[in-house]
Amino acid sequence: MKKIILIVLLSIGFIQAEEASAKVVYDLTTKNLADFERKVLKAVVANKAHYESKLKELEVTVVIHGGSYRYFTVDPAKTEYKTDKALLADYANLKKRIKSMADTYDVEFLMCGAGMPKHGLKAKDIVSYVKIIPNSTIGLIDRQNEGYAYIPIGD
């Protein structure tokens, strides 16, 4: 009888532990800097605060492809993005904010490796906290199969 009670209590604990976190995957393709700042940088901070106020954790993954490669380069001035004046004007600050998302908020950044050559990018051109994956579809499928809510952020 004690074993049954223990199993029931452990099962309840596991169920509650699963309910203690929420998960979201952002499908990031936008090249619009204002949208990126509002829908990712500011939104993640606000959403994390919301869930923390409810004693829940929010797990965040951002899958990078399309027009969004530009935000994750070591130096956009040495890439095809060298003509994006808005990006170049604020990139030092932007780069710090994005790194803070990885370091402070434990945001996972996954980049589509298949699209990198189209943009003239190699692994050495990408900031160190971004993990390069074979393609964006794999990242999105994997996270959605793990129960992540899907949020597209495109143009």
Segments from the language model and where they lie:
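Acidic/histidine-rich, surface-exposed loop or edge segments in extracytoplasmic proteins
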Residues: E18-L33, P76-Y81
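A cross-taxonomic marker for long C-terminal extensions/tails that follow the last structured domain
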Residues: T73-D155
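Structural recognition of the beta-strand scaffold that forms the well-ordered cores
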Residues: K23-D27, T61-I64, E108-M111, P152
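Sec-dependent N-terminal signal peptides
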Residues: I4-G13
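Acidic helix-start/capping segments at beta-turn-to-alpha-helix junctions
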Residues: L58-T73
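N-terminal targeting signals for Sec/Tat export/insertion, comprising classic cleavable signal peptides
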Residues: Y26-K56
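Surface-exposed patches in mature extracellular/periplasmic domains of secreted proteins
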Residues: Y51-V62, M111-G113
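Solvent-exposed coil/turn segments that connect beta secondary-structure elements
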Residues: K31, H65-S68, A114-G115
